[in-house]
């Protein structure tokens, strides 16, 4: 049976090999300009980040220190698994930042939703939407949830809208 250090090394090896084999894209953290915090959750926080010298904007999903590398690797695998659905944010890769204590802080590089969260969008635009628009949004949300459930994935952090 593997001890915790060996398990951590397995996950480090999986990340290194996934990047080397081009299963995952790696983005150097120094190539991002963080412009603002756009959300918080049980996992950590989400930052809006511009890729320097481009017009590309991403969302960087960071993780609280309580998350083990195995949890981050699992989330990456889940994102890769559901990257087939048009109403689920695209997963672009991974980045990390090294601290002075050589602790590596990982972030997922995700598609940036320029309208913000669905909750924010509905709060700001609900009265402007006709019933067809509202029906379409509900259908898209239900379709995305159905997709992940068909893959035996439970979201665990859906918010009340």
Q: Which functions belong to the PLM regions below?
A:
Residues 1-26:
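Juxta-kinase regulatory segment immediately upstream of eukaryotic protein kinase catalytic domains
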Residues 35-46:
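Protein kinase glycine-rich loop
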Residues 45-64:
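Glycine-rich ATP phosphate-binding loop
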Residues 64-86:
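The N-lobe alphaC helix and its flanking beta3-alphaC-beta4 segment of protein kinase-like domains
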Residues 90-106:
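Short beta-strand micro-motifs within the conserved protein kinase catalytic domain, predominantly
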Residues 102-117:
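Conserved short submotifs of the Hanks-type protein kinase catalytic core
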Residues 124-139:
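Activation segment of protein kinase catalytic domains, centered on the conserved DFG
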Residues 149-161:
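Catalytic-loop of the protein kinase fold
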């Amino acid at each position: 049976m593997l001890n915790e250090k060996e398990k951590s090394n397995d996950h480090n090896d999986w990340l290194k090999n996934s990047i080397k084999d081009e299963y995952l894209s790696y983005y150097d953290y120094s190539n991002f300009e963080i412009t603002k915090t756009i959300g918080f959750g049980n996992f950590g926080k989400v930052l809006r980040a511009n890729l320097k010298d481009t017009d590309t904007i991403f969302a960087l999903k960071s993780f609280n220190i309580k998350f083990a590398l195995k949890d981050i690797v699992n989330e990456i695998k889940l994102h890769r698994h559901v990257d087939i659905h048009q109403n689920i944010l695209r997963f672009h890769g991974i980045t990390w930042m090294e601290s002075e204590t050589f602790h590596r802080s990982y972030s997922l590089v995700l598609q940036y939703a320029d309208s913000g969260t669905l909750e924010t969008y509905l709060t700001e635009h609900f009265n402007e939407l006709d019933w067809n628009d509202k029906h379409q949004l509900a259908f898209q949300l239900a379709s995305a949830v159905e997709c992940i459930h068909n893959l035996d994935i439970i979201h665990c952090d859906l918010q009340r809208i």
